Curated annotation (Swiss-Prot):
The organism of origin for this protein: Mus musculus (Mouse)
Disruption-associated phenotype: Knockout mice are viable and do not show any macroscopically visible abnormality at birth. At day P1, however, knockout mice are shorter than their control littermates, and show misaligned upper/lower incisors and altered craniofacial development. All appendicular (forelimbs and hindlimbs) and axial (skull, vertebral column, and rib cage) skeletal elements are smaller than in control animals. The defective skeletal growth persists up to adulthood.
The protein, known as: Signal peptide, CUB and EGF-like domain-containing protein 3
Record GO biological process: positive regulation of BMP signaling pathway; positive regulation of osteoblast differentiation; positive regulation of smoothened signaling pathway
Tissue expression per record: Highly expressed in femur and humerus with little or no expression in non-bone tissues.
Length: 993
């Protein structure tokens, strides 16, 4: 992976291969070497080539392959490296040694044979070994016989030669005249005194180990070119000055020759010359946690995917992918060696890390009886006009009730009373209070049910009376009032009122004390917000002071049946408005006097506390958790789902049987529909309420007693009031069917299809939808803005985002294939343009890239100067490379194009880049072109680590910060990586040091 020339060559080879595949079938190549139709020499090798062959002479021969001649290595000046004789053989040579020598292990040197070591050399008495030969010696009183091995005892008197004083060095011969004549053994010459014998080169190579030359003074020894003569003048020893003494590595001259040694990581072999690499991984895995890879003279630890090597270069630590930017769209869970992305409720995972909204309405219409509206992360069922309101299960529609009395429902209550100059007010919510803490300094409380946004009732005037056209039409819109109060220097928090104050409030707000007792308040919405204001010069509030603002919305019912001849609906509405306004005036005074209570779930809460309280009261408010929270250690934690905050015990209590709570931090639980006080404790939603009809059943309200779904219908959910028909006249094999799969269809549809009940055929899922199951009557729409490449998709994994990814900044950025790290879609084209600031150039790092090789380069990534095919190309590839590479752009600007075919797909890429000062171009080029940057697996992992690549970019983009960088990040990078960069950066920044 690298420059544009290599991928270009690959494309050319693929093109040639494709054309050969089209036109070359008829002209099939013949292997002449196999058939024996070649005319190569017997000492040549036949090598087949397309449409021909070639002949190559074997090693040790020379020629054109059709005529080969043996090379006589013994004719070389160094005698082929042989120290004695060289014997040429066909295609090779061998070294031989003179008598008295044997061939060394290297096959070239000759070493002395110690003849005395075996059978005493055949000597009768003593044997003396010499270089290239040996001699037999006799003890005193004996002399050596003519056979030079046995010893003869000398007589005291007798023949001359038997006399011990005959004077011959070797052999004594008696002459006819009674004298003696001395002779020498073979290989010796008689000296001028006719008694002594002089050694020549013909005996034992003159005592020389290598070469011998006869001189008047005797043999003169010499050595082969790779050796030097020892101080004894006979032995040849190796020297470090010549060919490093034959050592593989380090050589030391010693009295006995050379002494070879090996560096750390190598072991000296038995020949005392060769160094062999030590495989450290064989012993205890080299101390590596995961993977040990032996290298020449050393070893390298590496980690499994999902782990990183620590600075001790032995231990592996899990990579916390969740700490990276852009790892997951929603939630990220780190796991050993990997991670998992999770999506919020109502969203579905696609492309490994992305979350898209689920269109629940495409899944069997969301289970809704009538209409379904998809919303981000959820959906909502709707009921058409005349079909009643939405059922508690959120999917069915209840039958409209024509005449419903407003007296039966629990109402909210605004109670105010005056005692002297003090006004005391309380907002009471008997049930279904919704408490929502919006922030640390704010909350909202709602009570009752807001009026629907409906048109006013049609009223028919008949004489002096007013009559509605029907009971349903007689509903009159309620009177609405909205007020806003501001309290300075107050905290916007609810605090449980102490017992004494609560009893006092009960006396003040006793029976009959409600000035608006005939005001049927149906809905209350209170919003409280505290904030610091007054930071500006013109602000009225002093800087740093807190301001609490209360916003109250009230709805009061107006009864049409209370109209009289003297007061119609407009009159009733005006009366109600005056009463509400009067109550709000008293409410304002009670708030300013800190005499306002909020009654929720039978407990009284003070809404806001002004700073005029006593020290004891203020101390009581310190570190107090707000309602809906309990203390867990030193923190305030909201009560979880399925519980409510019990103000008296200040604890979270599970919802009683027959109730549920879907929200956190609530002050009460909601009653289950049709509750008979049965069911589990701590129910978290309405579906867990007891007594619901199970799947395959229905009832009028969704609760028992239930009826099984009749044949030809089904119901997959609990608590429903109806069953869905199979459609198309289809029936089911039994009652109580729970799925369309129970419908007796005429054909069985496989995944990627849905059953059309109108034509009773299986239809392929359209592009942008999928179906993973058999025998279904719908296809699920792909999440978010994703789509599929083709129709008939069977999995959400085939849903892909077609948008080109990346962020293009002036100094740093990245490009990303669509749907990364999931497989990219087919038939897309992406174009990115990188335009760096003036006097800056572009550095690209490709950590890894995945493109299908079997696609015949249908998916291509190319980086050029511009869109013109003839412009300067920086990088081009159509293959997968998991080995990272860094390179500089060959042009100041880059036009990047990624195009995919309709065939195979792969993960694609995420490629970061950085722009650097052109003054450092030489340094940056020196770094990224050094092969050592990629030789080590640990260095490669640096280029893949999203955190380290940022740090690496700092060095490459701003080399002057290198030394500060190494101190700051020395624990992040392996020593070998820092060592690699140190010399380059130092020599560039300090060229004269």
């Amino acid at each position: 992976m690298g420059s544009g020339r290599v991928p270009g060559l690959c494309l050319l080879l693929l093109l040639v291969h494709a054309r050969a595949a089209q036109h070359g079938k008829a002209a099939q190549d013949v292997d002449e070497c196999v058939e024996g139709t070649d005319n190569c020499h017997i000492d040549a090798i036949c090598q087949n080539t397309p449409r021909s062959y070639k002949c190559i002479c074997k090693s040790g021969y020379t020629g054109d392959g059709k005529h080969c001649k043996d090379v006589d290595e013994c004719e070389r000046e160094d005698n082929a490296g042989c120290v004695h004789d060289c014997v040429n053989i066909p295609g090779n040579y061998r070294c031989t040694c003179y008598d008295g020598f044997h061939l060394a292990h290297d096959g070239h040197n000759c070493l002395d044979v110690d003849e005395c070591a075996e059978g005493n050399g055949g000597c009768q008495q003593s044997c003396v070994n010499m270089m290239g030969s040996y001699e037999c010696h006799c003890r005193d009183g004996f002399f050596l016989s003519d056979n030079q091995h046995t010893c003869i005892q000398r007589p005291e008197e007798g023949m001359n030669c038997m006399n011990k004083n005959h004077g011959c060095a070797h052999i004594c011969r008696e002459t006819p005249k009674g004298g003696i004549a001395c002779e020498c053994r073979p290989g010796f010459e008689l000296t001028k005194n006719q008694r002594d014998c002089k050694l020549t080169c013909n005996y034992g190579n003159g005592g020389c180990q290598h070469t011998c030359d006869d001189t008047e003074q005797g043999p003169r020894c010499g050595c082969h070119v790779k050796f030097v003569l020892h101080t004894d003048g006979k032995t040849c020893i190796e020297t470090c000055a010549v060919n490093n003494g034959g050592c593989d590595s380090k050589c030391h001259d010693a009295a006995t020759g050379v002494h070879c040694s090996c560096p750390v990581g190598f072991m000296l072999q038995p020949d005392r010359k060769t160094c062999k690499d030590i495989d450290e991984c064989r012993l205890n895995n080299g101390g590596c946690d995961h993977i040990c890879r032996n290298t020449v003279g050393s070893f390298e630890c590496s980690c499994k995917k999902g782990y990183k090597l620590l600075i001790n270069e032995r231990s592996c630590q899990d990579i916390d992918e969740c700490s990276f930017d852009r790892t997951c769209d929603h939630m990220c869970v780190n796991t050993p060696g990997s991670f998992q992305c999770l999506c919020h409720r109502g969203y579905l995972l696609y492309g490994v890390t992305h979350c898209g909204d689920v269109d629940e309405c495409s899944i069997n219409k969301g289970g809704c009886r009538f209409g379904c509206i998809n919303t981000p992360g959820s959906y909502q069922c709707t009921c058409p006009a005349g079909q009643g309101r939405l059922h508690w299960n959120g999917k069915d529609c209840t039958e409209p009730v024509k005449c419903q009395s407003s007296l039966g429902a629990s109402k909210a209550m605004l109670s105010c009373n005056r005692s002297g100059k003090k006004d005391t007010c309380a907002l009471t919510c008997p049930s279904r209070a919704r408490f929502l803490p919006e922030s640390e300094n704010g909350f909202t409380v709602s009570c009752g049910t807001p009026s629907p946004k409906a048109a006013p009732a049609r009223v028919i005037h008949s004489g002096n009376s007013t009559v509605s056209s029907s009971c349903h039409e007689a509903a009159v819109l309620p009177v609405k009032q909205r007020a806003s109060f501001k309290i300075k220097d107050a905290k916007c928090r609810l605090h449980l009122r102490n017992k004494g104050k609560a009893e006092e409030a009960s006396r003040i707000l006793g029976p009959g004390s409600v000035p608006c007792s005939d005001c049927l308040v149906t809905f209350i919405h209170l919003k409280c917000d505290s904030s610091r204001k007054g930071k500006g010069r013109r602000a009225r509030t002093p800087p740093g002071k807190e301001v609490t603002r209360l916003t109250l919305e009230l709805e009061a019912e107006v009864r049409a049946e209370e109209t009289t001849a003297g007061c119609g609906l407009p009159c009733l509405r005006q009366r109600m408005e005056r009463r509400l306004k009067g109550s709000l005036k008293m409410l304002r005074k009670s708030i300013n006097q800190d005499r306002f209570l909020l009654r929720l779930a039978g407990l009284d809460y003070e809404l806001a506390h002004k700073p005029g309280l006593g020290a004891g009261d203020r101390a009581e408010l310190v570190e107090v958790c707000r309602p809906g929270q309990h203390r867990a250690g030193t923190k305030c934690v909201s009560c979880p789902q399925g519980t409510y905050y019990h103000g008296q015990t200040e604890q979270c209590v599970p919802c009683p049987a027959g109730t549920f709570q879907e929200r956190e931090g609530q002050l009460s639980c909601d009653l289950c529909p049709g509750s008979d006080a049965h069911g589990p404790l701590g129910a978290t939603n309405v579906t867990t309420c007891a007594g619901q009809c199970p799947p395959g059943h229905h009832s009028g309200d969704g609760f028992k007693p239930c009826q099984p779904c009749p044949r030809g219908t089904y119901q997959p959910e609990a608590g429903r009031t109806l069953c869905f028909p199979c459609g198309g006249g289809l029936t089911t094999k039994h009652e109580g069917a729970v799925s369309f799969q129970d419908c007796d269809t005429k054909v069985q549809c496989s995944p990627g299809h849905y059953y059309n009940t109108s034509i009773h055929r299986c239809i392929r899922c359209a592009v942008g939808s999928y179906q993973p199951d058999f025998r279904q009557n719908f296809c699920t729409r792909c999440p978010g803005n994703t789509s599929t490449d083709f129709d008939g998709s069977t999995s959400v994994a085939q849903c892909k985002n077609r948008q080109c990814g990346g962020e293009l900044g002036e100094f740093t950025g990245y490009i990303e294939s669509p749907n990364y790290p999931g497989n990219y879609p087919a038939g897309v084209e992406c174009v990115w343009n990188i335009n760096p600031p003036p006097k800056r150039k572009i550095l690209i790092v490709v950590p890894e890239i995945f493109l299908p090789s079997e696609d015949e380069c249908g998916d291509v990534l190319v980086m050029r100067k511009n869109s013109s095919p003839s412009s300067i190309t920086t990088y081009e590839t159509c293959q997968t490379y998991e080995r990272p590479i860094a390179f500089t752009a060959r042009s100041r600007k880059l036009w990047i194009n990624f195009k995919t075919s309709e065939a195979n797909s792969a993960r694609g890429f995420q490629i970061p880049y950085v722009t650097y000062d052109e003054d450092y171009e030489q340094l940056v080029e020196d770094i990224v072109r050094d092969g050592r940057l990629y030789a080590s697996e640990n260095h490669q992992e640096i280029l893949k680590d999203k955190k380290l690549i940022k740090a690496f970019f700092e060095v490459l983009a701003h080399p002057q910060n290198y030394f500060k960088y190494t101190e700051k990040h020395k624990e992040m990078l392996p020593k070998s990586f820092i060592k690699l960069l140190r010399s380059k950066v130092s020599s560039f920044l300090r060229p004269y040091k």
